[in-house]
Each structure stands twice: as structure tokens, then as C-alpha cells.
């Protein structure tokens, strides 16, 4: 991101084309200060000592790369949010480029009432600190559920705001790539509070007609052309269309028990308008959804066309009749379960540590029988067998194809690390067990109500027993009032794969999935992309 004269991701892609190996600055070999060098992430931070100007307060949230704190400007007493990204969590050069690009995009975006404002940036030896506008009004779905009475009119207002954000992004050459309800917060708790886009971590700069092939985003909201690995800014309209569908009925339009199933449903693009409440939803609303979720991006509506659509234009006159308790209940369940999964994913991500990569590198040395610093597909297969990991030959080829970034027919140590977590997951669910242990504080073998309430203290309003009980009710299939490991594992693996514990591993996972879908004929690759 720092220097954005080229296209998004061009630095990484150009070097990969030339066979240039980007180092992992926090691998065991490199370390935080290798040969006296420090990792510098930002090109021009505001400063280096954030605590000279701001006082960091309570924790507001925690993500894959760091922690968000309440932040007070010492001189004025003004309150902000500070997103502190820990350098030790940036395990690959791609992670570092993501942070650079996120900051550059937020700096270049003009002020907009529905986009969170970046105030200042700081960088010290341990972290990058982003001081941003504070949004205290909660997540989109939580607000909807709390209101109780939910209508088409309310959905039209929300989607209009989201599309205006998309339009602003596209106008300034930014593709968001990760539009989902969790990435929108209300500015405050007032009824009239603005809805704001808060996360640009996967966004990229683009030029008209430019195509991308990196698989990013969240499964439910992913456009078919992302899986085909040839896409442009049209994917943001698709994601917004998925959000609109969920707003009107409470469940995603493309759903299955596994990520592979979700991907196939997306590629088929069959939209269900038969189940409740669709019979009472207006034809205009359904027409807009169909046009936003058109499988051909060339025929999908643009942001301006969405805003010009009759359902949006007449949004203030849209039906104000409640869509029913069923929709509200579904939205609540969808929101609550996302929170539990998200909390578990954070635990898993914390275990994908430098210590784990050290173990993986030891395995690489065992496989590298020729001692040339890279392994062939044969060595990979034999090595996996020796480690007791049974992987079908077809899957080994898929892993090899996905991991071999420079396409030289070998895996070097960094490429091996990038795919190894998926290899390990094929053999066991050790990270999922670690997540379960995190919740099961008293080692009873079950997650009990008190343990669940404590674990989700930062994520839900624990004054409401209703929320915690809703999770227990949904996950506890044998109705004994607590969650067993098997029930937890089933919940985590339903609908979206729990293994997306980190952004990079998610990219690798979907790359493998895309290759597999190509092999079984579910999709065809569309032309050359960047």
C-alpha cells in the first residue's frame, strides 16, 4: 500500500512473476530485528509514540492481527478507537501489504458520513496503531433485532447506505472485496445514528477493466467470478445483494453444510423466493435482488443503477408492514451464531503462532531429502505418509498447485508453510479442540452457560440472558443444557468452515477449493487475470 502508483497487489505479483521470494519478516529465521533491521510497515506515520498524545483505555474488540482500544486524546479529551496491529501477528509479506494498503486506502478516501474516518497513524517496534473515529452503536443486525418491528422500508434504507459507500469506493478506484454486515457499525446508540463502513482490510485499488484473481472475502458473500478467479468491482454489488437478501428473510441465499457446498450453490446462483416471508415481499424488492445477484457480472447492476432502481427510489414509501417474527428470529440467530464462531476463530488464530510454523519448518526439513531447500510433489507425498497424514493423490496435487506460487514445480519452505495448516486439518481437528478447551474453563468436557457468558462478554450484551440462551438452544442438540465437543464441532463446521482462522489460510483454502471445482467441472477459469 505505502506506494500506490501501481495496481493493487502489483508489488507482490510482479516479484512473484520474477521468481522473487518475499521474506516472512517474522519467521524464526528473520525475527523482529534481523541483523539490526526493524520491520517498517507504514511509509509516513503521524508519529512513533502514540502514548505521548493518546491514552489507551479498555479493549473494544479483538481480531486476527490485534486489538481495538478505546482511545482518548490527552490534550482535548476527545474519544476515538485505536486499532493496534501487532507486528508479530503479521506472519507473511501479504499480511504486511494488506496493512499498508488498508491505511493508504483510508487516507485517500474523502470524508463520507458512512465511512469511518482515519485520524492518525503511529508505528513503534511492536505494533502499528490506527486512530479512528469511534463507533459505539453496535452492529447492523443487532440494531435490527433490538428494534423488533422490521420492514422493507428499513431494509431499503440500510441497503441504500451500503450502496452509497460502494459507489464512493468505486468512484475513487477502490474495490471493497469484503462487504458483510459485520463490517458496518452504527456511529452511536441514537435512533438516527449513521451506519458506517469500518473495515478496508481486504480492499484494493483498481483501474477500469482491471481483473483480479486473488480469492478473498467471506463465503456467504462471495461472487461466482471470485471463485472463477477473474473479477472486478462488480463483486461488491453481489455482496450487497446477499446482504439485502439476508435483511429481507434472515438467511443467506446460498447456503450448504460445507464450504464446498456453499461454493457450488453460489456458482449455480439459484435464488429461493418461495419460503416465508418472500410471498409478502414486494416484486420490486425481489427484482432488485435478482439484478444485484446476476451471475454474469457484465449484466449485474452498477452502484448507480441500484440507487436508481424503483425500490430504492421509493424506499421511503416501501412497505412498513412487519416482515414477521420469523425474519427477526432468523436474523438474531444468524448474528448470534456469527459472534460465537468469530470468538472461536479468534482463539484458533491465536494458536496459529510462530511456534507452530517452527514445527512446520522442521517437517519440511524431513521431507527435503535432497537438501536443496525445496521439495517435489513426490517428496511431499512420501513426507506426508511418513508423518502419518493420509492425503489422496488428487488432493496432494491440488495442494501443490495452490502452494507453488512461482510455478517452478517445487515448494520452498515459505510455500510449504502457507499450505501446511490445511494439510494438518485434513488429518485432525486439533485447533478446533483448542478452541473448545478455551470455552471449557472448568475442564468438565462441556461448555456451560456461565462459561459461554464469560467467553462472549466482549461480543454480546451479557445483561440479556436471551442471547446466551439462544446459542445454547441452537447448538445443544440433545437438550441437556450444555454444549459437548461434538455439538460444538458440528456448529463450527456448519455453513462456513471454522478453519478460516486466518486471512492468509482462508485465501489458500479457497484457492484449493477453486482448483478442485475446476477439476470436477463445476467452474471454468475465465481468461487471464492480474
Swiss-Prot record:
<feature type="binding site">
    <location>
        <position position="480"/>
    </location>
    <ligand>
        <name>Ca(2+) 4</name>
    </ligand>
</feature>
<keyword id="KW-0677">Repeat</keyword>
<feature type="binding site">
    <location>
        <position position="368"/>
    </location>
    <ligand>
        <name>Ca(2+) 1</name>
    </ligand>
</feature>
<keyword id="KW-0418">Kinase</keyword>
<feature type="binding site">
    <location>
        <begin position="60"/>
        <end position="68"/>
    </location>
    <ligand>
        <name>ATP</name>
    </ligand>
</feature>
<feature type="domain" description="EF-hand 4">
    <location>
        <begin position="463"/>
        <end position="498"/>
    </location>
</feature>
<feature type="binding site">
    <location>
        <position position="478"/>
    </location>
    <ligand>
        <name>Ca(2+) 4</name>
    </ligand>
</feature>
<feature type="domain" description="EF-hand 3">
    <location>
        <begin position="427"/>
        <end position="462"/>
    </location>
</feature>
<dbReference type="InterPro" id="IPR008271">
    <property type="entry name" value="Ser/Thr_kinase_AS"/>
</dbReference>
<keyword id="KW-0106">Calcium</keyword>
<keyword id="KW-0808">Transferase</keyword>
<dbReference type="InterPro" id="IPR002048">
    <property type="entry name" value="EF_hand_dom"/>
</dbReference>
<feature type="binding site">
    <location>
        <position position="444"/>
    </location>
    <ligand>
        <name>Ca(2+) 3</name>
    </ligand>
</feature>
<dbReference type="InterPro" id="IPR050205">
    <property type="entry name" value="CDPK_Ser/Thr_kinases"/>
</dbReference>
<dbReference type="GO" id="GO:0005509">
    <property type="term" value="F:calcium ion binding"/>
</dbReference>
<feature type="binding site">
    <location>
        <position position="451"/>
    </location>
    <ligand>
        <name>Ca(2+) 3</name>
    </ligand>
</feature>
<feature type="binding site">
    <location>
        <position position="482"/>
    </location>
    <ligand>
        <name>Ca(2+) 4</name>
    </ligand>
</feature>
<feature type="binding site">
    <location>
        <position position="415"/>
    </location>
    <ligand>
        <name>Ca(2+) 2</name>
    </ligand>
</feature>
<dbReference type="InterPro" id="IPR000719">
    <property type="entry name" value="Prot_kinase_dom"/>
</dbReference>
<keyword id="KW-0067">ATP-binding</keyword>
<feature type="domain" description="Protein kinase">
    <location>
        <begin position="54"/>
        <end position="312"/>
    </location>
</feature>
<protein>
    <recommendedName>
        <fullName>Calcium-dependent protein kinase 14</fullName>
        <ecNumber>2.7.11.1</ecNumber>
    </recommendedName>
</protein>
<feature type="binding site">
    <location>
        <position position="440"/>
    </location>
    <ligand>
        <name>Ca(2+) 3</name>
    </ligand>
</feature>
<dbReference type="InterPro" id="IPR017441">
    <property type="entry name" value="Protein_kinase_ATP_BS"/>
</dbReference>
<keyword id="KW-0479">Metal-binding</keyword>
<comment type="function">
    <text>May play a role in signal transduction pathways that involve calcium as a second messenger.</text>
</comment>
<dbReference type="GO" id="GO:0016020">
    <property type="term" value="C:membrane"/>
</dbReference>
<feature type="modified residue" description="Phosphoserine">
    <location>
        <position position="484"/>
    </location>
</feature>
<feature type="binding site">
    <location>
        <position position="374"/>
    </location>
    <ligand>
        <name>Ca(2+) 1</name>
    </ligand>
</feature>
<feature type="binding site">
    <location>
        <position position="408"/>
    </location>
    <ligand>
        <name>Ca(2+) 2</name>
    </ligand>
</feature>
<keyword id="KW-0472">Membrane</keyword>
<feature type="binding site">
    <location>
        <position position="379"/>
    </location>
    <ligand>
        <name>Ca(2+) 1</name>
    </ligand>
</feature>
<feature type="lipid moiety-binding region" description="N-myristoyl glycine">
    <location>
        <position position="2"/>
    </location>
</feature>
<dbReference type="GO" id="GO:0005737">
    <property type="term" value="C:cytoplasm"/>
</dbReference>
<keyword id="KW-0547">Nucleotide-binding</keyword>
<feature type="binding site">
    <location>
        <position position="476"/>
    </location>
    <ligand>
        <name>Ca(2+) 4</name>
    </ligand>
</feature>
<feature type="region of interest" description="Autoinhibitory domain">
    <location>
        <begin position="318"/>
        <end position="348"/>
    </location>
</feature>
<dbReference type="Pfam" id="PF00069">
    <property type="entry name" value="Pkinase"/>
</dbReference>
<dbReference type="GO" id="GO:0106310">
    <property type="term" value="F:protein serine kinase activity"/>
</dbReference>
<dbReference type="InterPro" id="IPR018247">
    <property type="entry name" value="EF_Hand_1_Ca_BS"/>
</dbReference>
<feature type="binding site">
    <location>
        <position position="370"/>
    </location>
    <ligand>
        <name>Ca(2+) 1</name>
    </ligand>
</feature>
<feature type="binding site">
    <location>
        <position position="404"/>
    </location>
    <ligand>
        <name>Ca(2+) 2</name>
    </ligand>
</feature>
Amino acid at each position: 500500500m505505502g506506494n500506490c502508483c501501481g495496481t493493487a497487489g502489483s508489488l507482490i505479483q510482479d516479484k512473484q512473476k520474477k521468481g522473487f521470494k518475499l521474506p516472512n519478516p517474522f519467521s524464526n529465521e528473520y525475527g523482529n530485528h534481523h541483523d539490526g533491521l526493524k520491520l517498517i510497515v507504514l511509509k509516513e506515520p503521524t508519529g512513533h509514540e502514540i502514548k505521548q498524545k493518546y491514552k489507551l483505555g479498555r479493549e473494544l474488540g479483538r481480531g486476527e492481527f490485534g486489538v481495538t482500544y478505546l482511545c482518548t486524546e490527552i490534550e482535548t479529551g476527545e474519544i476515538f478507537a485505536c486499532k493496534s496491529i501487532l507486528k508479530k501477528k503479521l506472519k507473511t509479506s501479504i499480511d504486511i501489504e494488506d496493512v499498508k494498503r488498508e491505511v493508504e486506502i483510508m487516507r485517500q478516501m474523502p470524508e463520507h458520513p458512512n465511512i469511518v474516518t482515519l485520524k492518525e497513524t503511529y508505528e513503534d517496534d511492536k505494533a502499528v496503531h490506527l486512530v479512528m473515529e469511534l463507533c459505539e452503536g453496535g452492529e447492523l443486525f443487532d440494531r435490527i433485532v433490538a428494534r423488533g418491528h422490521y420492514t422493507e422500508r428499513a431494509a431499503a434504507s440500510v441497503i441504500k447506505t451500503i450502496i452509497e459507500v460502494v459507489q464512493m469506493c468505486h468512484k475513487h478506484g477502490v474495490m471493497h472485496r469484503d462487504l458483510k454486515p459485520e463490517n458496518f457499525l452504527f456511529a452511536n446508540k441514537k435512533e438516527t445514528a449513521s451506519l458506517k463502513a469500518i473495515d478496508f482490510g481486504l480492499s484494493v485499488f483498481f483501474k477500469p477493466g482491471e481483473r483480479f484473481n486473488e480469492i478473498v472475502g467471506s463465503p456467504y458473500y462471495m461472487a461466482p467470478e471470485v471463485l472463477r478467479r477473474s473479477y472486478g468491482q462488480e463483486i461488491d454489488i453481489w455482496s450487497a445483494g446477499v446482504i439485502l437478501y439476508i435483511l429481507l428473510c434472515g438467511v443467506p441465499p446460498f447456503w450448504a453444510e460445507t464450504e464446498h457446498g456453499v461454493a457450488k450453490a453460489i456458482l449455480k446462483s439459484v435464488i429461493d423466493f418461495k419460503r416465508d416471508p418472500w410471498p409478502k415481499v414486494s416484486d420490486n424488492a425481489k427484482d432488485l435482488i435478482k439484478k444485484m445477484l446476476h451471475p454474469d457480472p457484465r449484466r449485474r447492476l452498477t452502484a448507480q443503477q441500484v440507487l436508481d432502481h424503483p425500490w430504492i427510489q421509493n424506499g421511503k414509501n416501501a412497505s412498513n408492514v412487519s416482515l414477521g417474527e420469523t425474519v427477526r428470529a432468523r436474523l438474531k440467530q444468524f448474528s448470534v451464531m456469527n459472534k460465537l464462531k468469530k470468538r472461536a476463530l479468534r482463539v484458533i488464530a491465536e494458536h496459529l503462532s510462530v511456534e507452530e510454523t517452527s514445527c512446520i519448518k522442521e517437517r519440511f526439513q524431513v521431507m527435503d531429502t535432497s537438501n536443496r531447500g525445496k521439495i517435489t510433489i513426490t517428496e511431499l507425498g512420501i513426507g506426508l505418509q511418513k508423518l502419518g497424514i493420509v492425503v489422496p493423490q488428487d488432493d496432494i496435487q491440488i495442494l501443490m498447485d495452490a502452494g507453488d506460487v512461482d510455478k517452478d514445480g517445487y515448494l520452498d519452505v515459505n510455500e510449504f508453510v502457507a499450505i501446511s495448516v490445511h494439510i494438518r486439518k485434513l488429518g485432525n481437528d486439533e485447533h478446533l479442540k483448542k478452541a473448545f478447551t478455551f470455552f471449557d474453563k472448568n475442564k468438565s468436557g462441556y461448555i456451560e452457560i456461565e462459561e459461554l457468558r464469560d467467553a462472549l462478554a466482549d461480543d454480546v450484551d451479557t445483561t440479556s440472558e436471551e442471547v446466551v440462551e439462544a446459542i445454547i438452544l441452537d447448538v445443544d442438540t440433545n437438550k441437556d443444557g450444555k454444549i459437548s465437543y461434538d455439538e460444538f464441532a458440528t456448529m463450527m463446521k456448519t455453513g462456513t468452515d471454522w478453519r478460516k482462522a486466518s486471512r492468509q489460510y482462508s485465501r489458500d483454502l479457497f484457492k484449493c477449493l477453486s482448483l478442485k471445482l475446476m477439476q470436477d467441472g463445476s467452474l471454468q477459469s475465465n481468461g487471464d487475470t492480474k
